Amino acid sequence: LPKQRQTLLFSATYEKNIEKLASNVLLNPVVVKVENEEKVHIKQKFYSVEESNKTTLIPALISSNKAKSILIFCNMKITCDKLADDLYNLGLDVLTLHSDLEQKQRDETIILFSNKSYPILIATDVASRGLHIDDVDLVINYDLSLDEKIHTHRIGRTARAGKGGMAISLYTYNDFDRVELIKDTFRDIEDESIDKIEDDLSYKIDSELRTIFINGGKKQKLRAGDILGALTAGIGLHKDEIGKIDILDFASYVAISKEKISFVLEKLSKEKIKGKYYRIYEKWQNKKGDINCLKIHYFLK
């Protein structure tokens, strides 16, 4: 590096390794630290459970909190997949996110969860940092985190954008030491009995949205307004029937009211978007975590 230079270093955290790097490359730096402007409101509850009872508690925890967007953390990939299978067999729509998935699969999984097409995401700690998903109203630590720093990042996925959130941690007899370490960091943790969980059997854990895939994106100069126009002025959807629109380099994803999904797949395949026809799929994830095309509709001219 030249001796005369201006260097700026930005980091979301300032741990020892970053501090060491900074001391080697920065010249008499001015350090600016930005604190949170708003107090984060996360209510934490801890439940002592038997390992064999964890899975059956999940639906009750969701219904008792009237949660619509749920992020469940496991320590191992195999636990994620097993829990996903079990919840799927209980009739719940779930996604999985861990390091065995390719980057494209991860991206699509995050899109399907963040646009509310799936209510439940089961993940390892690959999802605890760097994700910006609004409106996650319940975090469940199916496995207690390995340390208090990981716990902090996990529960930070809820209560974003100034909103409140709930974080629930399940722990067994073997986790007592880690529970005490976490409690030393967080003074407002409530120990609860599973007997006090009020399971609302009438509560339906479901999504009102589904996702369509369009094989065109930023590289084709597609914009959200182009897709919105094709859906509303083009085929007659109401804006309330359209959710989040995500546009990547070569693909676009649109959340659609599930009552309208068949209509959209049929009609949009015959409607030009910005003067061109595109292939239209419905996107979904199977129990193995693979993102699939449930229905394929395309119109070529």
Protein language model annotation of sequence segments:
Residues 93-95, 101-124:
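Conserved helicase ATPase core of P-loop NTP-dependent helicases/translocases
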Residues 19-57:
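Interdomain hinge/linker at the junction between the two RecA-like core domains of SF2 helicases
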Residues 197-301:
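Non-catalytic terminal extensions of ATP-dependent helicases
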Residues 42-86:
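Conserved interdomain hinge at the start of the Helicase C-terminal
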Residues 31-33, 71, 88-102:
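Conserved RecA-like helicase motor-core motifs
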Residues 131-143, 166-169:
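A short beta-strand element within the Helicase C-terminal
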Residues 157-192:
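Conserved segment of the helicase C-terminal RecA-like domain
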Residues 1-35, 182, 188:
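Post-DEXD/H (motif II) to motif III coupling segment of the RecA-like Helicase ATP-binding lobe
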